[in-house]
Design a protein with these regions (language model features):
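Radical SAM enzyme [4Fe-4S]-AdoMet core and its adjacent flexible, acidic
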Residues: 5-152, 158-165
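Membrane-interface junctions of multi-pass transporters
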Residues: 130-134, 157-186
Length: 186
C-alpha cells in the first residue's frame, strides 16, 4: 500500500500548503499507484485553508482512492511558522469538518480515519462514527521517506532523528536500528 499527502482537490490550495507547484505530480502519483493495483490512501492535514475536506474526499474517490486519513495540522517543519499556526483549526472546527467528512466518506464507500492523538476526546470521535482512536504510530505502523530517500519515524517527524536511507540501506537495517526500536517502545 502507499499513502500520498493530498492537501486539497484544488491545485492552488494544495500548492500553497506544500510550498511548491506539486499538485499535478501528486495527482499523477495517485493515478499511477491506483493503476498499478496498489492500495492507495490519501492523508490530509486539516487547517482553515483546506477545511472543505469533503470536496477533497470526493476528488480522491473519483481517482479510485478508497482509504483516507486526516489529521490536525501538526506543528513541525515549516508548519511551525506564525502564519501556519494561525491556520490551525480549533477542536470545535475540527469536529465540524470531521462530521461532514464522515458522512461524505460513507456515501462514497470510503474508509476514513482521524490520526491525531489527543486532539479530540475519544467520546467525540466515537460519536462521529470513527472507529479507530488515534495513537502514535511512529516506527510502528508508519514511517516516511523524504524526497532524497531519508527515512524518518513518521511524516510529521521532520527534524532530528533519521533512520537511514531507503536508496542505500537495506530495509532490515533501518527497521532494526536501535533508534527505531526505541521509538517503537515509547
Amino acid at each position: 500500500s502507499v499513502q500520498v499527502t493530498l492537501y486539497s482537490d484544488k491545485a492552488a490550495v494544495h500548492n500553497a500548503l506544500v510550498g511548491v507547484d506539486g499538485f499535478g505530480d501528486t495527482v499523477a502519483g495517485i493515478k499511477n499507484a491506483v493503476a498499478a493495483g496498489l492500495i492507495v490512501s490519501i492523508n490530509t492535514p486539516l487547517c482553515s485553508v483546506n477545511r472543505d475536506y469533503a470536496d477533497t474526499l470526493r476528488f480522491a474517490a473519483s481517482l479510485g482512492v478508497r482509504y483516507a486519513t486526516c489529521s490536525g495540522l501538526i506543528p513541525s517543519g515549516s508548519a511551525t511558522t506564525e502564519g501556519s499556526v494561525a491556520t490551525r483549526l480549533s477542536a470545535s472546527e475540527l469536529e465540524d469538518v470531521l462530521r461532514d467528512a464522515v458522512e461524505i466518506a460513507a456515501s462514497l464507500g470510503m474508509e476514513l480515519d482521524f490520526t491525531s492523538p489527543d486532539w479530540l476526546p475519544e467520546e467525540t470521535l466515537r460519536g462521529l462514527g470513527l472507529r479507530l482512536i488515534p495513537s502514535c504510530g511512529a516506527c510502528l505502523s508508519n514511517m516516511a521517506i523524504t524526497p532524497d530517500g531519508t527515512v524518518v519515524p513518521c511524516q510529521s517527524w521532520l527534524g532530528g532523528v533519521t533512520l537511514g536511507n531507503i536508496l542505500t540501506d537495506p530495509w532490515e537495517k533501518i527497521w532494526t536500528d536501535p533508534q527505531c526500536a526505541a521509538i517503537r517502545a515509547e
